[in-house]
A protein has these predicted regions:
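Long, low-complexity or tandemly repetitive, helically biased scaffold regions used
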Residues: 9-12, 19-25, 32-83
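Short, charge-rich amphipathic alpha-helices with coiled-coil/heptad character
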Residues: 1-14
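Short, structured coil/loop segments at alpha-helix boundaries
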Residues: 1-2, 23, 27
Length: 83
């Protein structure tokens, strides 16, 4: 998966998980998505994407909440507290 494609995909996962995390009927569907976000957040790919964003290498109009230092962490913390 190319960098922009990956960032867009992960951003969509993050948005969906944030919207649906409080709906307990969706938790079984969210679990693999949360795991995928966690894997990305702890991978060298996330760090490279973040570094490239900070270096101005990504399009300025790209939605990039996934690259914030807290977005995934806050979601994972909330997810853990709900289980």
């Amino acid at each position: 998966m190319e960098q922009l494609e990956r960032i867009i995909y992960m951003e969509e996962l993050l948005d969906r998980c944030i919207c649906d995390i409080h709906d307990k009927t969706l938790h079984s569907a969210l679990s693999p998505m949360i795991q995928e976000l966690s894997n990305y957040y702890s991978s060298p790919l996330w760090l490279q994407d973040l570094d490239d964003d900070r270096a101005g290498k990504l399009p300025h109009d790209l939605k990039r909440g996934i690259l914030s230092e807290n977005a995934i962490y806050d979601l994972l913390t909330e997810w853990d507290s709900m289980r």
